[in-house]
Amino acid sequence: MVSLICTLQSHRDDVNCVAFSGDLLATCSADKSICVYSSRDFSELPFSPLSGHGYGVHCCCFSACGQYLASCSTDATTMVWSMDTGEIEAVLEHPGRSPVRVCAFSPDSSHLVSGGSDGSIALWDFTSRTLRRTGVVNDTSIVACSFTPCGQMFITGSTYGDLRLWDLNMNHLHAEKNAHDLGVSCAQFAPKMMKGTDGCVQFRLASCGQDSLLKIWIVSLLPSAGIKMQLAHTLTGQSAPVLSCAYSPDGQMLVSGSVDKTVTVYQADEGVLLYTLHQHDRYVTACAFSPTAPLIATGSMDKSVNIWRMEEGSSAQGKSLPDEKAAFSNTEGRKACGHSRLMVSEWSEEEVLAWLREEGLEAVTDAFKSNNIDGEELLSLSKETLSSDLHIESLGLRSKVMKKIEELKMVPVYNGTPDEFLCPITREIMKDPVIAADGYSYEREAIEAWISTKNRTSPMTNLPLQTTLLTPNRTLKMAIFRWSTSQ
């Protein structure tokens, strides 16, 4: 059977990607951050969240050894982070400054590939952190990429609907046009090579798309040095666009997440549906298997990440699991699993104390407890009140507390905020919404900064803006004002 063991709720916006290493889990979000957890107890690491991207983070992936994490963003960069310190090791600027939608390491981590919204592909030499080759698929966005197990080729998937196979010299080896009607959303090779009946090397590839289908392909390297790609299975276990898919470490199982809010688990060889998991409240955008434990992580637009455990001998074909919340017991002295930082003003005194312990501020918990500090009082504190009323004598300690409080105040998005009130670039509530030439509304300051640095292309469509004229959206501004005053 499959059981839900933990729900992580650290992000303030849509979760876009989840990735496991041997002992870590990374999640990234439209809130511009990356969270990193221990995969043993799912406590958040001391240096998490990672903040460095200027816009939403679309994808993240670990190097083979787990020492590095790569993340890519609308800000046109792929960042490399040290998992020892949480520090930025390198910032790789995508050719043409296009938003970067996807990134992937080769199995030996010698190469890193990234795909852009303008159809550009960058192949990086990871050892030297230098650009090795570039390629392009015209009139589309690259939203999926994955290396073959041998590391000598990689696949890309686009919003146009095609799958394309490339070698490390960016030679185009094969194109499977119209692989998914309306566009590909994800593609991943199984981790192991196979041999065909004629002795040729074969790879299994899973892909999913806006056509609500999950497909399994056999990619064969023919003796004549040609490439043959055959459709082996078409899986129809979900009723809406399938946004993500991932193989288990042994290649025996396949998981997928969908707009219909479900997670499906298949036996990969025959495409047999094993489980349908119901838990998320919105689209399931990301999924991944742990390489070292029978665990699945799923991420969603409901801002949460669910951790599922696969029990040995799971074979209940087609079983649909009920929508039940599972408890998770936290151990003392670490960050509480799934502790929400939204609506701080509504925190109870106990939640404030839990937050202090999470932030390593145990030294002031007695003072806060004796003064009955709840969320509303927490936000009103100053250095002066910490000294005069709470009698915290250490200047350094007062400064640390105020720094953490200021970080809480910077959280811009609250539960229940209508999505149309959020700027597509910053994902923050708009104060001065304007309509750009692409028809979308943005925060004025954000779109002006975008236009000045992004060669006048639309943040939403990546097509050229016919004019830089911005029209105030007074109707939206009034709607935001009415909503905010009612909260």
From Swiss-Prot:
U-box domain location: 416-487
Superkingdom of origin organism: Eukaryota
Keywords: Repeat, WD repeat
Disulfide links within the chain: none
GO molecular function: ubiquitin-protein transferase activity
Signal peptide interval: none
WD repeats by residue range: 10-47, 52-93, 95-134, 137-176, 179-227, 237-276, 279-318
Biological process (GO), any one: protein ubiquitination
Domain called SAM: residue spans: 347-411
Protein name in UniProt: WD repeat, SAM and U-box domain-containing protein 1
Organism: Danio rerio (Zebrafish)
